[in-house]
Amino acid sequence: MVGVQLMDNETIDKLLKRFKKKYERAGVLKEFRKRAYYTKPSVDDRLKRARSKRRAQRANEESNA
């Protein structure tokens, strides 16, 4: 669970900014979206391989350019 404490002389805006940063770094929203529906392990593996392949192609294109 992500939480923040209000520090001395801290505005609500700064508190919310710190909370948002911690929330994003913790990956809460990403995990929530991932668990919103079930995907079979075989589908997960296929998507993971496709992402890896695209990443490798981009890296190869950048190194050749």
From Swiss-Prot:
Q: Which NCBIfam families match?
A: S21p
**GO CC, any one term:** ribonucleoprotein complex
Taxonomy of origin reads: Bacteria, Pseudomonadati, Chlorobiota, Chlorobiia, Chlorobiales
* Protein name, UniProt field: Small ribosomal subunit protein bS21
Return the similarity comment: Belongs to the bacterial ribosomal protein bS21 family.
Q: Name one GO biological process term.
A: translation
Q: Which UniProt keywords apply?
A: Ribonucleoprotein, Ribosomal protein
Region of interest (Disordered), residue spans: 43-65
What is this protein's gene name? rpsU
Pfam families recorded: Ribosomal_S21
